[in-house]
Amino acid sequence: LSTATLYDKVWALHQVAELPSGATQLFIGLHLIHEVTSPQAFAALKDLGLSVRHPERTVATVDHIVPTTSQARPFADGLAEEMLSTLERNCQENGIHLNGLGSGRQGIVHVMAPELGLTQPGMTVACGDSHTSTHGAFGAIAFGIGTSQVRDVLASQSLTMNKLKVRRIWVDGALQPGVFAKDLVLHIIRTLGVKGGVGYAYEFAGPAIEALSMEERMTLCNMAIEGGARCGYVNPDQTTFDYLKGRPHAPSGEAWDRAVSWWKSLASGADACFDDEVKLDAATIAPTITWGITPGQGIGVDEAVPTLEQTPEEDRPLAQEAYRYMDLQPGQAIAGLPVDVCFIGSCTNGRLSDLRAAASIAAGRQVASGIKAFVVPGSEQVAAAAEAEGLDAVFRQAGFEWREPGCSMCLAMNPDRLEGRQISASSSNRNFKGRQGSASGRTLLMSPAMVAAAAITGHVTDVRSLPPA
């Protein structure tokens, strides 16, 4: 149908059955698992006497709990060691491929699968992780799921789901120098709110989206969930195909040509019907940073913390809570705010282009006195590629630590944590209270280049004022 969106087409192709409840049983083409949300699912499977239905459609890695300073086994943290050992055993017993530490293919699950060509247009992808929407960058429909649903996918390769509405977010114009996909998505969430996408899939489209690289599209789709959307996607195009070609799991030869012509047919048609549409202009977006305790509490780096009068009535209680927790005054400029810790990495911004952008700001400069700054590549492949380019040396010479791959300080499940009231400049995706490991720690979300600028100056700084080396 020319009125069908990509979401409609992919949904229809994966529909196993309509259930009496009105929900759909949806086939899952690719199931990604990791050490945190899979152990209970495997245990439940065993209790039920069930086996993994499609081990060949299941791929595992380890990311959340791994230390980034030394990955020697056994880990100092006994629980982390137990979680990894359990994953290794579950994969071995069930014939599931594990991209483990030192394999050359380990990484944060949402960095690892795309770079190996596992994620492809037209797929349904599920993973027991909130930020599975990342894979929508390829024109896939990708959902984060809970542990009981991980069990269901292992057992049946399908999920019970209700079909979403589709909102197209059309972005005209071009992003200005120093403004990245991270700024764009923070701007979108600021504009539509953290609950604005509830019940929706977001289709990102328009000239500004088409101009994004695949890695930038992954950043954008990664944070669709932070705007309340269940998933976000970009229609596959030549950028998608060029990225996938030659990757280990991508089709090759004649199968490649067939795949590309099939992938092209999936894009939303010119007459596609959307349930809602929002239009934005990329040229008006400044480097954007969160000031509060949700990803929706964002402002341009050249703006001030909003006053209550500038805040919609329903958002005022949260704004007051954020002023108190963050120790900020309404009307206070965000530029110049001192930071303690600078973290570059995560499934949002731990890819090679992110590290290049940050390194271009760090090159020839020095991390400010008293600032702890560190870089955590998103995968072993990203680390190897960055080291081959000498990016690790650029960071080290500037005074950053260069770490081993993992989720690191995005979340408090490994040794990388804030202490006390420390404030971090972070390229990750969530700034909730306590998210980075200290119950009173504070997080400012921003692009990797902005984090690098904060590390060099010791405070929130407009990256556009620091010309790249």
Named regions from a protein language model:
Residues 1-469:
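Fe-S-dependent hydro-lyases/dehydratases of central metabolism
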